[in-house]
From Swiss-Prot:
Top EC category: ligase
Family per similarity comment: Belongs to the class-II aminoacyl-tRNA synthetase family.
PANTHER family (UniProt xref): GLYCINE--TRNA LIGASE, CHLOROPLASTIC_MITOCHONDRIAL 2, GLYCYL-TRNA SYNTHETASE
Organism for this UniProt entry: Wigglesworthia glossinidia brevipalpis
Pfam families registered for this protein in UniProt: tRNA-synt_2e
Transmembrane region(s): none
Subcellular location field: Cytoplasm
Record-given protein name: Glycine--tRNA ligase alpha subunit
Keyword set, alphabetical order: Aminoacyl-tRNA synthetase, ATP-binding, Cytoplasm, Ligase, Nucleotide-binding, Protein biosynthesis
GO cellular component: a single term: cytosol
Phylogenetic lineage: Bacteria, Pseudomonadati, Pseudomonadota, Gammaproteobacteria, Enterobacterales
Gene name linked to the record: glyQ
One Gene Ontology biological process: glycyl-tRNA aminoacylation
Length: 302
């Protein structure tokens, strides 16, 4: 029997724990991708090593389709792996992980398609590849070159599994709502039973009923609060980063609502990127003041 989504997540956690990753919990805030988790966005900066993995609920408002599209969602799950420094054989380890969850790499058409990644609001970009299995993208590979507008050294390797799409391959189905989330002696639960109404109602809200004036007000207030926090005598860069994420959330919802012009969108992006850069520099300087304590014998410091 193929893996349920619940079993898939558990197997990925166990696999990456065996590769030396600490298993973290998802960020308890609305984000567009697992990269926004501070354990990725901030920890990718500076020389200190980090090996972590976690599941992250993600929201991309513009991808909402009122529950009518079989494989496109405005809310979905990513499994994130972060390794710094990135192992030379990280792609081989990834292929082994596919076999571990039940995907035979010899009997399936697996392609690495060049696709460099960037996130303008986070001031981030990297060299990357999409991983396609039998014609569907299921994973994004990225080697971060910059985060928060700062150069990444050593390079951080990121693997982002698309949980729903991998589960569709494993369960051999074409509609995400037919996925089996869990199956035990109490009952079998499908993705539709768990999330179908969420997709419908959130799409209606995102595209039709989100209050534009309220979203603009929230954006400005969160931006203002973040600026205040980084300008304190003893800057609070972690709360500031959370306020930045709230501002990005409102910006993305305004964009999905088509409530801002291209010129305004560019202006907001510049403001968010600048704020991310200031927070990132504060984080890096703080870690430097501690002597980069996670570097064993200063081995990663140059």
């Amino acid at each position: 029997m193929s893996l349920t989504i619940q079993d898939l997540i558990l197997k990925l956690k166990l696999f990456w724990e065996k590769q030396g990753c600490a298993i973290l919990q998802p960020l308890d805030m609305e984000v567009g991708a697992g990269t926004s988790h501070p354990m990725t966005c901030l920890r990718a900066i500076g020389p200190e090593p980090i090996f972590i993995s976690y599941i992250q609920p993600s929201r991309r408002f513009s991808d909402g389709r009122y529950g009518k599209n079989p494989n496109r969602l405005q809310h979905y799950y990513q499994f994130q792996v972060i390794m710094k420094p990135s192992p030379i054989n990280i792609q081989d380890i990834y292929l082994i992980s596919l076999q571990e969850i039940g995907i035979n790499i010899n009997n399936n058409d697996i392609k690495f398609i060049e696709d460099d990644w960037e996130n303008d609001t986070l001031g981030a970009w990297g060299v990357g590849w999409e991983v396609w299995i039998n014609g569907m993208e299921v994973t994004q590979f990225t080697y971060f070159q910059q985060m928060g507008g700062l150069n990444c050294f050593p390079i951080t390797g990121e693997i982002t599994y698309g949980i729903e799409r991998i589960a569709m391959k494993l369960q051999n189905i074409d509609n995400v709502y037919d996925l089996i989330w869990s199956n035990n002696f109490f009952q079998k639960i499908t993705y539709k039973e768990m999330f179908y109404q969420n997709e419908i109602q959130q799409s209606v809200y995102n595209f039709e009923h989100s209050n534009i004036e309220f979203l603009l007000f929230c954006f400005k207030q969160y931006e203002k609060e973040a600026i205040k926090l980084i300008n304190l005598k003893n800057p609070l860069f972690i709360p500031a980063y959370e306020k930045l994420l709230k501002a990005i959330y409102n910006f993305n919802l305004l964009d999905a609502r088509k409530a801002i012009s291209l010129t305004a969108k560019k202006n907001y992006t510049i403001r968010l990127r600048s704020l991310t850069n200031e927070i990132s520099k504060l984080y890096l300087n703080y870690r430097k003041s501690l002597g980069f304590p996670m570097c064993k014998n200063n081995e990663s410091i140059s």
